[in-house]
Amino acid sequence: MGKKHKKYRPEWRAVEGDYEDKPLEKPLKLVLKVGGSEVTELSGSGHDSSYYDDRSDHEWERHKEKKKKKKKKSEKEKYADDDERRRRKEEKKKKREREQSETASTAPVEPFTLPKPVEVVVEEKKRKRDKFESESEADEFHPAVKVEVEQPADRPVRACRTQQENEATPHQQLLEHFLRLLQRKDAHGFFAFPVTDAIAPGYSMIIKHPMDFSTMKDKIAANEYKTITEFKADFKLMCDNAMVYNRPETVYYKAAKKLLHTGFKMMSKQAAILGDDDIAPEEPVTEMMPIHTEYPKKSKKQPVKEPIISDMYELEGNACSLTDSTAEEHVLALVEHAADEARDRINRFMPNSKIGYLKKDTEGSLMYVVVNQDPEGEEEETHPVDLSSLANKLIPGLTSLGFKDDRRHKVTFLSSAYNTQTLQNNSIYPDLHPEEMDMLYSAYGDETGVQCALSLQEFVKGCGGFTKRLVDDLLDKMTAGDHSKAVVQIRQKRNLPIDEAKSSLCDMPGTDGGGMEAGSVLDFMSMKSYPDMSLDMLNTLGKCVKKEPEHEDGHQHFDDPTKLLQEFQDASVDRVGSRPSSNLSSLSNASERDQHHLGSSPHLGVGDQAEMVQDPYEFLQSPEPGSTANS
C-alpha cells in the first residue's frame, strides 16, 4: 500500500488573497431530494462569515507549520488512525441498527410486502452510497462549509390487513391461489365480472346460472366452498356458460375451452403436489392480429366501455388447437373431476362406507377394489374375496358350512300336509281337506283370495241360480277360469254330479229338482262333512222319500235295522259274559263278526281312526244299490 496523502485544498490560498476584497455574503442553501422522502440541506457559498471574524493573519502561518508536523505524525500513527476510524464506523453502524430496531418495534408488523420496483432500488442504493461518502469525509470536510441536515420524515404507516384476511383458513388460501392462477390465464379479462343483458343481449334467458371470477372470489371470502370439487364445479359452469352462449367460431368460445382445459390440468392432483412448473412449461403467447368476424357478438365477460374488440381476436388456426396429447389430458382432467364429484356424493349420502367392484388380479384371484377410499392414501385399496369372507367357520361335528337363511324372505309351502299352515287352514275351513285346499290356493293365489271367493259365494247364498252364475262368472274372470276348474275337481272327488260344478263352495248340493235322477244313488258318507247344508240335504232327500216305496221294499227297510240290532245285542252279551284274562297280551283277536260290524281291520292308521270316529252316525248307511234299483 502506498502512502495516503491528504486531499489537496487550494481554497486556503483563495481565502488568503481575497479576504480583504470580498464582502461578507449570505450562504446559499442547497436542497437534495432522494426518493421523495428524505431531504438533505447543505448551506454554504465556499466561505462562512463567522470563520473570518475569528481568524487572524498569524493563524495562517501557524496552520502551515501544523500541517507539516501533522504529515510526519500521520505516518507514525497510521495504524492507530485506521483503528480509530474502524471503531467509529462500528459505533455508527450499531447506533443505526439500534434506531432501526426501535422504529420497527413501534411500527405495525406487515405480513406481506410487495417487491420494490427497480428504479426505487437504484435510488436507494445511490442514496446510501452518497450518505456513506458524506460520513467518511465528515472529519476532513472544510470547516467553512456549514452542513444542515434535516431528519427525514417518518414513513407513512401502511394500513394493516383486515381480520378476515389474516384469519383465512388453509383451504381458503388454496382456493385463492387457484383463483389467482386462473385469472392469470384469462389475459383479456373475459371472465372477470358478471355479464348483463346490456353486455350480451338475451344472456339471462339463455344462461340460468351465471358465474364469473368475482362471484367465485366472494364465495371464497364467505367460505362457501367446503371442498375443492365445488370450486371446480363453479369453474366448469363458468366455462360451459361461455361455450353455450357463444358460437364455436368466436374467440370467446375458444378462450373458454382453452381456459377449461388449462384450469383442470392445473388443479389436478399431480399439479397440486408437484407444482405448475413440473407439470408443463408456460405456454407461448399466441399471435394476435385484427380480423373481422361475421357474428359481432359481445363477450360473455366483456366490459361495457369496449365497443369494438376486433383487434383482440385470434387466428382460428392458433386458437385452442388441441392436439391428441392435449385432448387426452383434457379428458383425463374431466374424468378426475367427475370422480371427485362422485366421491363427495358417496361420502355425503353414505358416510363410512366401502363401495367398490370386483376384478381379477394378475394371479387370477378375485379382488374387491374400493372406489371411495381415503384421498390421502397413495395406493389402491383392495381386499381379497374368498370363502372365508363369505361364510362362517365350520362348526365342530359338521362337515358343511353353516349358512343362515334370511327369515324375512323365507318361502314356505302354504298348504303342506304336515305343516302348521295346513292345521291352521283346517281350523278355519274344517270342511275342506288339504288336497282341496291346494286346489283353492292354486285357483285364488293365497289365503286372502280364498276367503274373498268364499265370502262372495256366502253372500249370494239363497239368491237364486242367476245370481250364483254371476258370481261364478266374476270369479272365473278374476282367476282366468281356474275357479270353475277347481269346483269341478272338488265335485269329482266328492262324487257329486257334474251339473252342480258351477254352484258355490258354500252351497255344495244343487237346488234343482231335475238334477237328481231316479236312478242316482245318495252318497250320505260323502255329504257328511257339510253339517251346515243339512237343510238342503233334507230337501233333496225328501224328494226321494215322497215316492211311495213298494211293500217288499218297506219290509226290507225295516228288516235290515232289526237284523243289525239283533247282532249288536248278541255281541254285547258275548262280550259281557266272557271273563278277561289277567295277561293283556293273551287276549284273543276279534272275531270275523266283530270285524265286520265294528271295523274293517284291527290295525288302523292314525288317519283311518280319525275317519272312523269323526262321524257319530256311522251305522246309518245308504240303501243298497240293488234295492234302490228295484224300487
UniProtKB/Swiss-Prot annotation:
GO BP annotations, alphabetical order: chromatin organization; regulation of transcription by RNA polymerase II
Region (Disordered): 1-26, 39-116, 571-631
Alphabetical list of InterPro entries matching this protein: Bromodomain (IPR001487), Bromodomain-like_sf (IPR036427), Bromodomain_contain_prot (IPR051831), DUF3512 (IPR021900)
Composition bias type Basic and acidic residues, residue spans: 9-26, 50-63, 74-85
Stretch list, region Histone H4K5ac H4K8ac and histone H4K5bu H4K8bu binding: 244-246
PROSITE patterns: BROMODOMAIN_2
Signal peptide: none
Low complexity composition bias: residue spans: 581-590
Domain Bromo, chain residue ranges per copy: 166-270
Pfam families according to UniProt: Bromodomain (PF00439), DUF3512 (PF12024)
GO molecular function: lysine-acetylated histone binding
Protein's job: Plays a role in chromatin remodeling and regulation of transcription. Acts as a chromatin reader that recognizes and binds acylated histones: binds histones that are acetylated and/or butyrylated.
Protein name: Bromodomain-containing protein 9
Gene behind the chain: brd9
